[in-house]
């Protein structure tokens, strides 16, 4: 019943795969995974990075200036997170791997929250350029790391970045996008699923169960 949300269903199933504890799919969990993780974490970060770049730098990747300690720390985390996801995949630990994907998105969200480029723009636009350059490099890495789990969303990220799909060999790089590169048209990566939609699915499930009794 969600033909337009194959990645959401895929993500919900992957995060519920039994590895060290039993679990099962529920529509409420499907909604929660979408709204609280895909929308609030992954989609939110990608959207903020792209919208801020569009607003402050005419939708072009800004040049990177000198890096401050907070930038260096984010760059170091960016270098190691994709390899952790790859290691989890090699060990068939898919729930752990999807958690690693979200950790990369959380890194981006935290970096923007800590650097607050919207507060720095008027006083130091060059600094904002450096912040958004690094944020966009994280977005580009999400386009790589998300591909095994969320192939349609990964393709959408690359489309919004106007970037040719990259390979895992490039994952962890902070030089996937050059300064001056023109980005594509941004949009919401995921949309919130309202309670009424889930309630309809639960009612359908209830009717099917009754018909089988």
Q: Across the structure, where does each feature detected by a protein language model lie?
A:
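Secondary-structure capping and boundary motifs in well-ordered enzyme cores
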Residues: 1-4, 30-41, 70-78, 90-100, ...
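Active-site-proximal binding-pocket segments
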Residues: 13-16, 20, 52-64, 70-128
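Basic, alpha-helical terminal appendages of large translation-related enzymes
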Residues: 23, 87, 92-93, 102-213
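Catalytic adenosine-cofactor/nucleotide-binding cores of aminoacyl-tRNA synthetases and other
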Residues: 1-72, 163-189, 193
């Amino acid at each position: 019943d969600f033909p337009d949300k194959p990645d959401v269903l895929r993500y919900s199933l992957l995060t519920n795969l039994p590895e060290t504890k039993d679990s099962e799919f529920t529509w409420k969990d499907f909604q929660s995974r979408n709204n609280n993780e895909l929308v609030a974490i992954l989609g939110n970060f990608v959207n903020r990075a792209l919208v801020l770049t569009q607003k402050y730098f005419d939708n072009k990747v800004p040049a990177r200036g000198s890096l401050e300690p907070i930038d260096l720390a984010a760059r170091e985390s960016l270098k190691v997170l994709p390899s952790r996801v790859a290691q989890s995949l090699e060990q068939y630990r898919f729930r752990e791997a999807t958690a690693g994907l979200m950790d990369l998105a959380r890194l981006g969200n935290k970096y923007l929250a800590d650097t607050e480029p919207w507060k720095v723009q008027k006083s130091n636009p060059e600094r904002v350029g450096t912040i958004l350059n690094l944020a966009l490099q994280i977005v580009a890495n999400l386009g790589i790391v998300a591909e095994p789990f969320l192939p349609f969303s990964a393709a959408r990220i690359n489309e919004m970045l106007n970037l040719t799909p990259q390979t895992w060999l490039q994952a962890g790089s902070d030089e996937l996008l050059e300064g001056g590169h023109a980005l594509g048209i941004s949009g919401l990566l995921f949309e919130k699923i309202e309670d009424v939609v889930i309630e309809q699915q639960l009612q359908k499930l209830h009717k099917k169960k009754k018909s089988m009794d």
